[in-house]
């Protein structure tokens, strides 16, 4: 059975942002490998954060018409977890137990609800295991 992996927003940003070449290359490598060897997920939260960061907060902002094309690519390549009321409640539980920010807890809750075993993130604690199910990995280390 293939692993299920979840991508945090920063991995998706680096996938399309070429201003940090080393991280861009590594994000592409992990992304391509995951498409071949795993079932991959993001959430609607990741999509919306990507739009804001890629269009406004990176060194060379990506035009919205290109972001739209990138999103179409992601939609055909990945499974999209839709955040609902239960996901928000799960995020509160994760925050209370593990002390992540609420937004990181929402990413974790989405990954757990998608039955993922790996969460790729640059920002969260590398190697931590959540609920004995989900391991956080930093693909840039």
Label each PLM-derived region with a short phrase.
Residues 1-42, 57-65:
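Short, well-structured N-terminal submotif of metal-dependent ribonuclease cores
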Residues 11, 46, 87, 107, ...:
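Alpha-helix capping/helix-boundary segments
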Residues 41, 81, 137:
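General small-molecule cofactor/ligand-binding pocket signal
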Residues 58-78:
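Helix-adjacent hinge/juxtasegments
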Residues 79-119:
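Active-site neighborhoods of divalent-metal-dependent phosphate/nucleic-acid chemistry enzymes
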């Amino acid at each position: 059975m293939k692993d299920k992996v979840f991508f945090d927003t920063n991995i998706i940003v680096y996938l399309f942002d070429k201003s940090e070449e080393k991280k861009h290359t590594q994000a592409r490598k992990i992304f391509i490998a995951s498409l071949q060897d795993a079932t991959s997920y993001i959430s609607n939260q990741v999509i919306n954060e990507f739009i804001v960061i890629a269009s406004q907060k990176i060194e060379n902002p990506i035009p919205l018409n290109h972001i739209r094309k990138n999103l179409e690519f992601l939609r055909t390549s990945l499974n999209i977890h839709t955040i609902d009321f239960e996901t928000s409640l799960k995020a509160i539980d994760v925050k209370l137990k593990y002390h992540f920010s609420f937004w990181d807890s929402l990413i974790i809750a989405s990954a757990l609800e998608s039955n993922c075993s790996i969460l790729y993130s640059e920002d969260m604690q590398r190697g931590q295991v959540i609920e004995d199910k989900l391991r956080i990995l930093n693909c840039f280390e």
